Amino acid sequence: MPSNYASYPSLIDRTVFITGGADGIGSALVEQFARQGSKVAFVDKNVEYALATIQRCVDAGVAHAPTFYEVDLLDIDALQAACASAIVALGGVTVLVNNAANDDRHDWRDVTPEYFDDRINTNLRHYFFAIQALAPQMLEAGVGSIINIGSSSYMMKEDGFPGYAIAKSAVEGITRTMARTFGPDGVRVNTVLPGWVPTERQLAKWWTPEGEQSTMNNQSIKRRILPDEFAQMVLFLAADDGAACTAQQFLVDGGRR
């Protein structure tokens, strides 16, 4: 591990399932957990990027190469089948990171009922059904950590993707409801919200000098927040070090809000 990042003994051999792990923040999550010695399985529909993520982990000399399942998260049956396979392959799953999302820009005037449903299904629905598939064996074991990746976009009143922002605001509802339900049986549920974390996709599709300057004007930390830095908060909540944290939301936004 880089000397400036913590190592968590409790994450060695810990079993982790991540949605949307092929690129961006998801890829950073897969790599950072693997570097901790965790046994990681992840799903995504981008096979090329997923294999590249696995190769980076292998090249880094991780103890356990990540396991990949090709899944379109709009297909709940396929997602839950991958969850079941991961339970067998990893010997159980004790950490779930619901990460996959799509923040494509759209004008509210152009949104049809079908497109609205697609935004909800892409950015919210699969969170619940991954929990439904993996939580029972966590509850039976009496231990587990579920980390839902949200977005600060709705807090910041950001414009240009209402379907995404609406779906992401509901992630906090999943977190708090399920934290109350699962807490008595030792399973924690939290939300981690990124601010502006410039991934390859973000930079290619939407970056402008003016947009970055506006972000820097609002951030207390006057630099870009890196995907690996965001991942550190998730690692903490997955580790035993975060054992007293549940039903909370944690912002990693450089003090933007």
Each language-model region and where it sits:
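Short C-terminal tail/terminal secondary-structure segment
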Residues: 2-10, 156, 235, 246-257
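Conserved glycine-rich cofactor-binding loop
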Residues: 15, 22-23
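Substrate-binding pocket helix/loop in short-chain dehydrogenase/reductase
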Residues: 107-120, 215
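Active-site helix of classical SDR
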Residues: 131, 167, 175
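C-terminal substrate-recognition "lid" of short-chain dehydrogenase/reductases
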Residues: 131, 143, 223-252
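Alpha-helical segment proximal to the catalytic Tyr-Lys
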Residues: 136, 180-184, 243
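Residue(s) in the substrate-gating loop at a strand-loop-helix junction
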Residues: 151
